[in-house]
Amino acid sequence: MKFELDTTDGRARRGRLVFDRGVVETPAFMPVGTYGTVKGMTPEEVEATGAQIILGNTFHLWLRPGQEIMKLHGDLHDFMQWKGPILTDSGGFQVFSLGDIRKITEQGVHFRNPINGDPIFLDPEKSMEIQYDLGSDIVMIFDECTPYPADWDYAKRSMEMSLRWAKRSRDRFDSLGNKNALFGIIQGSVYEDLRDISVKGLVEIGFDGYAVGGLAVGEPKADMHRILEHVCPQLPADKPRYLMGVGKPEDLVEGVRRGIDMFDCVMPTRNARNGHLFVTDGVVKIRNAKHKSDTSPLDAECDCYTCRNYSRAYLHHLDRCNEILGARLNTIHNLRYYQRLMAGLRKAIEEGKLESFVTEFYQRQGRPVPPLNVD
């Protein structure tokens, strides 16, 4: 992987990730394909929304279908027939979300398989081996996603262990001869001094990109913005920056304003299946009765297949009848909305008009522009 940085506007960056499998224009949003599929979508449909890279889930793909079946096909690209690049998370967040059924030690994490209850152990070395078999174009180190709230002492211990796991991840990645990219993950909760230590330690180890982890886990938005404002200027300018598990459209906008290049989140697909649809002026809850006889498109400014062909009334009807097509059409639209938003942000950065774009984005939704505390 090669990262090319074209231009900046304030702290926002316009560039691209270059892989053997294709080019990803940044800032970029990555749809989430947890089990080797973006739910309800064929790879061709995902590509048609404008997505150039997707995310797969190491933890879930390890449990099902498993490494051996994956290797029978070649790798995850061959298994799911996605031709572009794939980023896989390390399994750290899924382990974090298991809560009481896992035990974290210096060696790794002991937990029970959520499918059948069998005892399982996952550590940095195993995570690197699984992601190697998946053929991931971007591999994420294995870390502990520090929960929120966490006091300073716990956050420090967690961050320091994640740094040790980062070195173990780096060593195993290299010993496998993996020629793809490996990203480090910055931890430290909402504490700036701990984030500083994490950044310094990761940069000393050396990675192809740097992710900001441990955010969007329940902390106030102001804390997320503050940590991004503090961390991003410390990161190498020639490496991509990835905000993990984020988020709502406004979170993408605010991340870009603060220097983030990559995002992923289940929100557009999960919300689509629940009839919660993103449009230029905000959000449409298609289940509401007011859409029952509305013949207008979901979003007159959207060029997706759904908006070009179907009315709000039809989408409302599909939702009320619990038809599978409704979830699919909603997903097509939400993913296209996210990709159109990213394209708009990229164009605004190119033209040096990002803050004008941001102002219009919030004005259309009747909301104030969040403060930006950067030099």
From Swiss-Prot:
Q: Which GO terms describe its biological process?
A: queuosine biosynthetic process; tRNA wobble guanine modification; tRNA-guanine transglycosylation
Q: In which pathway does it act?
A: tRNA modification; tRNA-queuosine biosynthesis
Q: Which UniProt keywords apply?
A: Glycosyltransferase, Metal-binding, Queuosine biosynthesis, Transferase, tRNA processing, Zinc
**One of the record's GO molecular function terms:** tRNA-guanosine(34) queuine transglycosylase activity
- Name any cofactors this protein relies on: Zn(2+)
Instruction: Cite the EC number.
Output: 2.4.2.29
Q: Does the keyword Transferase apply?
A: yes
The protein's enzyme class: transferase
Q: Which domain of life is it from?
A: Bacteria
Query: What Pfam families would the database entry show?
Result: TGT (PF01702)
- Positions bound to Zn(2+): C302, C304, C307, H333
Q: Where substrate is bound, by residue?
A: D89, S90, G91, G92, F93, D143, Q187, G214
Q: Where, by residue number, is the active site?
A: D89, D264
The UniProt note on the cofactor reads as follows: Binds 1 zinc ion per subunit.
Region (RNA binding) residue spans: 245-251, 269-273
The record describes its quaternary structure and partners as: Homodimer. Within each dimer, one monomer is responsible for RNA recognition and catalysis, while the other monomer binds to the replacement base PreQ1.
Q: What is this protein called?
A: Queuine tRNA-ribosyltransferase
Q: Which species is the source of this protein?
A: Salmonella paratyphi A (strain AKU_12601)
